[in-house]
Amino acid sequence: FIEGTYGGRNHPNQEEERRRFCEEIVRVSDRGGTVLIPAFANGRTQDIVMMLHKYLPELNVHVDGMGKRIAKIYMDHPNVLKEPDLLKSSWRWSKQVSSKSDRKKALDADCIVSTSGMLDGGPSIWYLNRLKEDRRNSIFFTGYQATGSGGRSLLETGKVPIWKQKVP
């Protein structure tokens, strides 16, 4: 079997993209803002947290949503991971949101990694609704935004449905 989702395309250098991504996070943090990273629960959340731990260990990073449970499953099965120790240390380094008060504290973080990656639910909507008024804050998408998703709506119109209302 051959998977060809990204076949036939030239892609930018991954290391260069990681560097640019991290530089932008630092830029937002330096101006007093918070970066919201809506991420898919399986794989993307863990990859983002490991990257931030590796390249920006000085940041205050909070993780919320189903990606936490997926990470626990991965850590319980280190044999399926390329870098199990990096995931484990990255998870200890980041702050796991597990209560309403944790969620409120996360609003002051440098970076929040949270599900749903397409802004169709999950804690990301809660964070977006609270961070959207402060222009120092930013949202960074790291995955595909399907037609009809909240993320695609935000990219195309500058508005996203939050609790059935389109808000800028």
Walk through the language-model features, giving the residues of each.
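Acidic/His-rich, metal-assisted hydrolase cores and their charged scaffolds
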Residues: 1-168
